[in-house]
Amino acid sequence: MLKSFRLRNLDVFPNTILSPMDGVTDAPFRRLCRVLSGNRMGLLVSEFVPTDGDAVFCLDGHKQLKFFPEERPFGVQIFGRFPDKMAAAAKKIAENLHPEFIEVNAGCPAPKVAGKGSGSGLLRDLPRLQEILHDVKSALDSSSVDIPLTLKCRIGWD
């Protein structure tokens, strides 16, 4: 029997989430999964969006932020290692794109991500992860939209 769960004010049915994978779960792939599953995907999530590269986060140029209306409910996953940049990006994404949630990635084990202190690399620096979550949550709470924050993480580093 398919079950549901609640994410703040959103009833998600069924209780399935298409796991975001960089280079795989782009908008056409997510749309295909939604259609071929017969709408048995409760949530779809973007590929992770980098936040560290720009001096000021810009929505343009991030193909990961493209999504189709039928992908809703839809979340945007962000990654980085700088709390202020992640918070600014989350607020800009929330206020301009209105996803159902923002997700912080603390789970990617790829050396090019974790090795630079992002993704699962944050699990080696829990005070930084705590600061990121605090700052992103504060930014979302101060935004003009009501969007929850979620976290993708691993059980541990080792």
Regions found by a protein language model. Name each.
Residues 2-6, 21-96:
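Glycine-rich, positively charged N-terminal anion/phosphate-binding segment
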Residues 9, 13-15:
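Generic N-terminal amphipathic, Lys/Arg-enriched alpha-helix
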Residues 16-19, 44-47, 74-78, 102-104, ...:
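Hydrophobic faces of well-ordered beta-strands that scaffold small-molecule active sites
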Residues 49-50, 80, 108-110, 153-157:
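Active-site-proximal loop/turn and secondary-structure-junction residues that shape catalytic pockets
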Residues 50-55, 106-126:
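Glycine-rich, proline-tolerant flexible connector loops at the mouths of alpha/beta enzymes
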Residues 65-73, 122-150:
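Alpha-helix-loop-beta-strand connector modules within alpha/beta enzyme cores
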Residues 84-86, 127, 148-158:
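Active-site glycine- and acidic-residue-rich loops that bind
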Residues 89-112:
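A contiguous, low-structure linker/loop signature
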